[in-house]
């Protein structure tokens, strides 16, 4: 591995330990040229995943982008960093276990929303407002009305006008229709 300080190719592993519930390996390394120490984290990647965007573009899946989105949704909420990492690891494992290499972005969003809904309802609403592109207060009102009626944690996929789509899936008082 290349040293991040001097760019030298020869580094030695001094210590390896399991990291994040065994889902990754944390390695302490030392550069043979400049003697600087640094840490790397290695994760198992079952397959290369690609995200299919709404405009049918296909881009490589980025775990860091998913983690950043989850962290933003959970910012200033009572969820510690360790739990956020477990959430992200679980989401990535679910995506890898799906058997698909091309995953529509709306499916990733639905998976994240389902998880956030169970963890923190405010984070769920924050994420949904970006994912569904809320533009008006009625969009927030519609999702707030849908929350008490959804007992099983199933999150509707809302294309286009969020309020209309949520209303279409919910009956009177926000109770989700089956």
UniProtKB/Swiss-Prot annotation:
User: Where is each ATP-cone domain found?
Assistant: 49-139
Q: Which GO terms describe its biological process?
A: negative regulation of DNA-templated transcription
Q: Name any cofactors this protein relies on.
A: Zn(2+)
Write the record's keywords in alphabetical order, separated by commas.
ATP-binding, DNA-binding, Metal-binding, Nucleotide-binding, Repressor, Transcription, Transcription regulation, Zinc, Zinc-finger
Record bears the keyword Flavoprotein: no
Q: Where is the composition biased (Basic and acidic residues)?
A: 7-21
Lineage top rank: taxon: Bacteria
Give GO terms: molecular function aspect only.
ATP binding; DNA binding; zinc ion binding
The segment annotated Disordered runs over: 1-21
The answer, when asked if Iron is one of the entry's keywords, is no
Which note does the record give on the cofactor? Binds 1 zinc ion.
The cross-references to InterPro entries, in alphabetical order and at most eight, read: ATP-cone_dom, NrdR-like_N, RNR_NrdR-like
User: Where in the chain are the unnamed zinc fingers?
Assistant: 3-34
Question: What PANTHER family does its record include?
Answer: TRANSCRIPTIONAL REPRESSOR NRDR
Family affiliation: Belongs to the NrdR family.
Give the function comment from the record: Negatively regulates transcription of bacterial ribonucleotide reductase nrd genes and operons by binding to NrdR-boxes.
- What name appears for this protein in its UniProt entry? Transcriptional repressor NrdR
> What is the species listed in this Swiss-Prot or TrEMBL entry?
Gluconacetobacter diazotrophicus (strain ATCC 49037 / DSM 5601 / CCUG 37298 / CIP 103539 / LMG 7603 / PAl5)
Lineage per the UniProt record: Bacteria, Pseudomonadati, Pseudomonadota, Alphaproteobacteria, Acetobacterales
């Amino acid at each position: 591995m290349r040293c991040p300080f001097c760019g030298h190719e020869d580094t030695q592993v001094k210590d390896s330990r399991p990291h994040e519930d065994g889902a990754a390996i944390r390695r302490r390394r030392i550069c043979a040229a400049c003697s600087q120490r640094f840490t790397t984290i290695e994760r198992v990647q079952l397959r290369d995943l690609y995200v299919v965007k709404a405009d049918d573009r296909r881009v490589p899946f980025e775990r860091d982008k998913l983690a950043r989105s989850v962290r933003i949704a959970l910012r200033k909420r009572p969820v510690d960093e360790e739990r956020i990492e477990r959430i992200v690891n679980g989401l990535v494992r679910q995506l890898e276990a799906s058997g698909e290499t091309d995953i529509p972005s709306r499916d990733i969003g639905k998976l994240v929303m389902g998880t956030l809904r169970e963890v923190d309802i405010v984070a769920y609403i924050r994420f949904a407002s970006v994912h569904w592109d809320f533009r008006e207060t009625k969009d927030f009102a519609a999702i707030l009305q849908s929350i008490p009626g959804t007992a099983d944690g199933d999150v509707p996929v809302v294309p286009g006008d969020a309020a209309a789509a949520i209303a279409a899936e919910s009956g009177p008082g926000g109770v989700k229709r089956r």
